[in-house]
Amino acid sequence: MFAKLDHLEAKYEELNRLISDPVVIQDQERWRGYVKSHAEIGEVVAVYREYKRVAAEMDDARQMLREEQDAELRELAESEVEVLRERSDELRRRLRVLLLPKDPNDEKNVIIEIRAGTGGEEAALFAGDLLRMYLRYAERRGWRAEMLNVNETDLGGIKEAIVLLEGRGAYSELKFESGVHRVQRVPATESGGRIHTSAATVAVLPEAEEVDVEIRPEDLRIDVFCSTGPGGQSVNTTQSAVRVTHLPSGIVVSCQDEKSQHKNRDKAMKVLRARLLDKAQQEQQERIASSRKTQVGTGDRSERIRTYNFPQNRVTDHRLNLTLYRLEEVLQGDLHEFVSALITSDQAEKLKTLD
């Protein structure tokens, strides 16, 4: 571990020199690449330097302990060694986490697809609740949200919604939201007061750049049609809605949110690129025989990951066995505790594979 850290520190110093070099600065593309690399390893180098400083102080304190005869000063030195040892252990743990292999998609924007599952209209209303939850989380994080497509029901629910959230590290924070979300509550239409169970599925995809996925024009079939509103009625007379079919994979994406056919096509292509990248990465993972099944789940869209129980004001994440009794706050976008716990759990599983 320390040989790798020494190498990173030397690389950091070299990058420091390069980004200040007038010749390099003239080549903006090259300069931006160096700045990006410099930022990526900056935290681990800073923590390593702090670790070395603490280690040096601990050596000095131990030296004093060996040489000091005065009982009071020895007691002070022992106390200092203990404090420094705890700090050293904490920094060492942090360094191990920082050295874990990075998910190349972590810094990307994220596309979230929400679909009503079993439960009819109640499932569609719950899908709408989930959409608002993620939009409010994005607001809290200062991210930009762009609706790519939404298919509403007559009662204000959502059959399907696709939203792009743009912000640094958006995918790293929300990638564990993929799966089946279940709701238990008394529907507004239920006169007998019985609790119903409904579900919605969430798919979380990193936004794919054009360079990430090659799409040949001849592999696409593009159909245009009139936009429809809740219940299927036509909402305009121009053919502005777009359906893009990727023939080799069979993936179909429809977008009708914009009045412009061109804008709907652009949005559909964004979603298609993300789905193709996700498909390619899932196939790659399946080919790896030793692919780990982590505590936070396999990312399988059919996996039940969380239950929202309204009568008990309870939200339970089944992968973590973590229950919070503040359902309304969670639905208002207060997801930090779940997001943080899922990331920590994933890191712990990765660390096990290193041991």
UniProtKB/Swiss-Prot annotation:
InterPro entries assigned to the protein according to its UniProt record, in alphabetical order: PCRF, Pep_chain_release_fac_I, Pep_chain_release_fac_I_sf, Prokaryotic/Mito_RF, RF-1
Location(s), subcellular: Cytoplasm
Keywords (A to Z) from UniProt: Cytoplasm, Methylation, Protein biosynthesis
SMART domains linked: PCRF
Similarity-based family: Belongs to the prokaryotic/mitochondrial release factor family.
UniProt cross-references to NCBIfam families, sorted A to Z: prfA, PRK00591.1
Protein name, entry field: Peptide chain release factor 1
Organism expressing this protein natively: Desulforudis audaxviator (strain MP104C)
